Each structure stands twice: as C-alpha cells, then as structure tokens.
Amino acid sequence: MTCFNRKEKTVKSLNGLIQGNPEIQFSFVVADDGSTDGTSEALQEFAGVTIVSGDGNLFYSGGMRLAIAKAKESIESYDYCLLFNDDVDFYPLAIEKLCKKENGIIWVGPTSDEKGQLSYGGVRKISSWRPKTEIIMADSKEGTACDTFNANCVLIPWETFIKLDNIDPVYTHSMGDFDYGYSASRSGAVIKVSDQFVGVCPDNPVSVSWRNIELSRKERLRRKENPKGLPGKEWFHYLKKNYNVLTAIIYSAIPYMRIIMKK
C-alpha cells in the first residue's frame, strides 16, 4: 500500500482489514510518501507494519513500486500478496472470502460507490487495437476472467507475485496498475474478478480531471500533463506496450484534439 496525508483513511483501512479478517495474519509494507499529518507515527502503532518513506514525489505508481520492491526483499514466504488502496472501506471477512476461492489465480476484489454501483474491479479489453476497456465484476462465484485490474484490492498468490516484474518505472501515478495487470496476463497468470464487493471506494469525479469540458483549454492541458492526469510520454508508452505503435501514435494525439475542440 502507498499513502500520503490521509491518516484517518489509512488507519481505518488497516483496522478494517485486521479486525474484519481475524483468521488472517497480516504483514504490511506501506510506502508513506512524506506525509506531514502524522500518518507514519500512526502506522508505527500497528504490529507487523514495515514503513518505507518517500519525499512527497512518489505518487501512486512510485509508492507502489517502492512497497513492492520492499515486500520482495522479505526472507519469509507468505501465501498471498494483497495490493490495496487506503481509501477502501473494507467489508468484514472480505479478504478471507477471496483467500478461499480457486487457488493459483490472481483475484480482484471489486468495490462499489456509496450508492452500491460498481466503481473499481476487473478490467476487460473491448478492442485489441483501441484503448477501450470496461470495468467488470463477476455474476457467479466462479469469477470472471479479465485482462487486467484496478489495484484497489487485488489478491496475488505469493509465488506469482515474486515472479512478476515490478510496476514499470515509466509511470508516475496513473496507468501503473493497469500495466502491471497486463504484464501479469502476458506472463501467463490468470486474473479473475470476484462476484462480491469487498468494500466501498467511490471513483474519482470527472469534474476534477482534464476531461471536464467546463475548464479552459489551458487548465485542461495543465491537468492532463499533471502526474495524476494523463501525461503524454507515459500515455504513449502505455499504448505502445499494451497495444501497438500505430495505436500509440493515433490515441496519444486524441486527448490534445479533444482539448482543442472542447470535447
């Protein structure tokens, strides 16, 4: 897990996992990206937490890379590695239920928004050449196969986790989890999404993103190139790696066209 200045959410998330899954013995690796709100001090109150510190410039992908690298240094062997976000309000027994599903598979735990609608989960490609995907959850206990995932809650068998490469260093914030999942699929790992929500995690509103057409072109461009937006170099790399060069050339230009045309 990675965190930055969300002490209450971070503490609540860890407490939810520990208290809600009494049959599981957790060991946490948390990348704290230079929080100034007492997050690091609060984390030290938990048993079994290893903290790796950043300087405030890690963002999501950088923080997760640091945490994953630290976890792989462990001399102990675990059953699973759980990737999760600290803004997930986990339901009781959510992770225990995932652990009881089919072995040897990467299981994605879908989340809902506050209205009970799917917010994050498994991700399936709609096209082999267009970067169009859909977020899905299963409709049966057997789960549904997917191509990648939102890493808000992902349970990876330890042996699989150790073999996987870390998150690509090109990514600062967004796209890192999608790319990580695609890499896992290419390595031969099977990814399935569960049929039960593991908790609540509202998705990010369009109003704060570069896609908000009410913003000026200048502001939209600034937000797009921000690490939390869709930086051009990272987006091109993502498209080339997970689709092809032609797709990367065409679709890396489209966001700029949308901004110019106010769409």
Could you tell me what each predicted segment is?
Residues 15-25:
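Short, acidic, metal-binding catalytic loop of nucleotide-sugar glycosyltransferases
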Residues 16, 32-41:
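A conserved acidic beta->alpha catalytic loop
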Residues 54-73:
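Glycine-rich, basic loop-to-helix element that forms the pyrophosphate-binding segment
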Residues 76-89:
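Short beta-strand-to-loop acidic/aromatic patch adjacent to the donor-nucleotide binding site
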Residues 89-124:
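Conserved donor NDP-sugar-binding/catalytic core segment of glycosyltransferases
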Residues 135-156, 222-223:
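A recurrent flexible, glycine/aromatic-enriched loop bordering the glycosyltransferase active site
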Residues 149, 154-165, 170-197:
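A short, conserved alpha-helix in the catalytic core of glycosyltransferases
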Residues 206-263:
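Non-catalytic, C-terminal membrane-associated alpha-helical segments of glycosyltransferases
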